[in-house]
């Protein structure tokens, strides 16, 4: 699926409204003449079996943490079966490993009592959050934060209640939805939450996909979030330059300074969809 508002012109040949939903049947996929289908959602298991039975390779690339993410990247490269794909997969996996080590070496010195307690939301509308055994739980831990959902021993995607959020009272709230931070600050019924009082509710950046979710842009999430949480420990990190380097290295794309700021503010790129 192509993000319908955050493509930043990286692949202008892809139609603005290009997307494939779960409603597609095996027959419709077969008619497209594809050789391989990559899938990751458990809701697609039946379709994947039907495609495999029809002679079309349906490859599961689901992942829940960085180790399984690296495996899915390598599997994708092997399926594409080109030297370039394998080179880029190896480069990405190495970059992820080095980023994790670099940040962990610093955050491992933070005392438990000094760690920020963070809630990572899809949005305030659904209050859908990430618990244990998720990519969000992985990057939060590496960045030296405590995932308040995991703290309750809750796994996977969770739909929370407002009462739970008040009970846990996180220091920081992250949301994947544009404008959620500004919205939260205007809600009188949320005003007693620590994150609202302290203005530490943040719209999480997004690019090709949401950085804080199941995205290879998690490399950027690690660098951005660690500096956001502990600016004094990561004062030397230049997030804007990291963004430039990342998209140039892994997408061959020279992103503009304007688009970097739009990305960091989770805004629709100028001219997108016109």
What is the role of each PLM region?
Residues 1-42, 148:
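A short, structured surface patch at a secondary-structure boundary
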Residues 24-33, 53-54, 159-169:
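Short helices/loops that flank or line small-molecule/ion binding pockets
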């Amino acid at each position: 699926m192509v993000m319908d508002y955050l493509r930043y012109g990286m692949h202008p040949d892809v139609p603005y409204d290009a997307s494939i939903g779960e409603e597609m049947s095996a027959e419709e996929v077969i008619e497209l003449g594809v050789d391989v289908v990559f899938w990751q959602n458990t809701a697609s298991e039946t379709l994947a079996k039907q495609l495999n039975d029809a002679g079309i390779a349906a490859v599961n690339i689901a992942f829940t943490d960085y180790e399984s993410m690296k495996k899915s990247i390598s599997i994708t490269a092997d399926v594409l079966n080109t030297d370039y794909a394998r080179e880029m997969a190896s480069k990405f996996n190495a970059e992820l490993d080095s980023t994790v080590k670099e940040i962990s070496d610093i955050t491992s010195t933070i005392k438990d009592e000094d760690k920020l307690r963070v809630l990572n939301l899809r949005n305030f509308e659904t209050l859908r959050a990430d618990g244990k055994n998720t990519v969000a739980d992985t990057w939060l831990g590496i960045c030296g934060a405590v995932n308040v959902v995991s703290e309750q021993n809750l796994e996977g995607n969770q739909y929370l209640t407002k009462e739970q959020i008040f009970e846990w009272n996180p220091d920081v709230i992250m949301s994947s939805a544009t404008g959620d931070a500004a919205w939260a600050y205007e809600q009188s019924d949320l005003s007693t939450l620590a994150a609202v009082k302290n203005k530490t509710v943040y719209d999480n950046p997004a690019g090709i996909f949401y950085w804080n979710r199941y995205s290879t842009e998690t490399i950027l999430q690690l660098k951005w979030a660690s500096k956001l949480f502990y600016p004094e420990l990561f004062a030397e990190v230049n997030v804007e330059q990291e963004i430039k380097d990342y998209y140039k290295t892994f997408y061959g794309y020279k992103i503009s300074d304007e688009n970097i700021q739009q990305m960091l503010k989770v805004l629709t790129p100028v001219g997108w969809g016109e």
